[in-house]
Amino acid sequence: MKILFIGSRLYDDIDYYVRENGIESIITESNEDAINLDLPDQVFIVPRGMDSPKQIAISQNVDAVVPLIGIDPPLIEVAKMKEELEAETDIPVIAANVRAVRLTSDKIKTKEFYNEIGVPTPQYQILAKDDFESKLKMEFPVVLKQGQGQGGKDIKVAESLDDVKEYFEEFDHALCEKFIEGSEISIEVLGYNGEYVPLSPIYKGETTLEGIHPLNKIKTAPCLVEGLDNNLVQRTAYKVAKNLGSDGIFEMDFMFSKDEQQLYAIEVNTRPNGTRYLTTATCGVNSLCELVNMAAGKFSIKDIQDKLEYYYATEIPIGRYKGPDLNEPLKSFKNNDWVVHGPEGYQRITIRADSKEQLDRYVEDLI
């Protein structure tokens, strides 16, 4: 079995799993100084874009391609390459298709998609710089966003018309969305060949008018929010994934309004994401390793169900880890009760335990 991985930044998460399964690994990477280039069996430094990875997949006679790209801009080119390569050869590319990327990479199209499939999403309208004062019909506070962007980029919680005016000093248009006071929830869904399985919902904290970046929040799992049925989160996530009809990882963000007792869908990411460590800690399923299983033809809902475990877990920003040495593989819970991830100085620790009490003791000892 030979797999081409596109991008090296996330590869250390799965290097141990690739080796355990006897898979020959090739990486294409556009940055010759990128991390993890010493890990795979073979590396090709290539120009940006998908033309070279496509040609290398063919020339090296690989069995599958797994893009490991955790940012949004390249996803449409990856999707186009997927459709071209799969049409021209029998090489599967474990990634979202063009339709799914177009629907999820534009927040306005995502809103329209939710409405089409009957999934509740916060009230919204599109505003323009020239006439927003007369067109704005929603009560404050509202959330202003751009169609594209990730990680909280270009988002502002506006509490007054002056806040909106300030936002339009930089932008010509905005998606204006009702501010939902409540709980932030994320969930990963795995999908391949028409099979979809939602994993454990993650609690990311309460919404704030300050709009705290996700990387600065403490996250916990399983999601324990009063009044919220986690089965509803999983059913809704499954419905979204099934209607997107694509392959790979889907990370979905939701808000739960306690006042309205309503679950709202916010957005979808069709790529590896920051939730994956906490998901793995909680339920024992590593979404990146499942991409490898998809490539190897070993992915199935039954296999996922057989792997499911049940732990209490938390993810905490720590900056720089100063605790005990971890066991190999470092990015796996196979021989560890916690893993450390993120760049030096901006590290996070994800800890798991059999009980809430044991988790609290771990946190007290480590943090």
Curated annotation (Swiss-Prot):
InterPro entries: ATP-grasp (IPR011761), ATP-grasp_PylC-type (IPR003806), ATP_grasp_subdomain_1 (IPR013815), CPSase_Archaea (IPR043673). Catalyzes the synthesis of carbamoyl phosphate from ATP, ammonium and bicarbonate. Proceeds via a three-step mechanism, i.e. the phosphorylation of hydrogencarbonate to carboxyphosphate, a nucleophilic attack of ammonia on carboxyphosphate yielding carbamate, and the phosphorylation of carbamate forming carbamoyl phosphate. GO terms for cellular component: cytosol. SUPFAM superfamilies: Glutathione synthetase ATP-binding domain-like. PROSITE patterns: ATP_GRASP. Mg(2+) 1 binds at residues 253, 267. Gene3D superfamilies: 3.40.50.20, ATP-grasp fold, A domain (3.30.1490.20), ATP-grasp fold, B domain (3.30.470.20). Its EC number is 6.3.4.16. Coiled coil: none annotated. It is an enzyme of class 6 (ligase). It catalyses: hydrogencarbonate + NH4(+) + 2 ATP = carbamoyl phosphate + 2 ADP + phosphate + 2 H(+). Mn(2+) 2 binds at residues 267, 269. Lacks the domain involved in allosteric regulation present in CarB CPSases. Several lines of evidence suggest that obesity is associated with elevated levels of intestinal methanogenic archaea. Consequently, this enzyme may be an attractive drug target in the treatment of human obesity. Residues 111-296 form the ATP-grasp domain. Forms homodimers and homotetramers (dimers of dimers). The keyword Nucleotide-binding applies. This is Carbamoyl-phosphate synthase. Binds 2 magnesium or manganese ions per subunit.
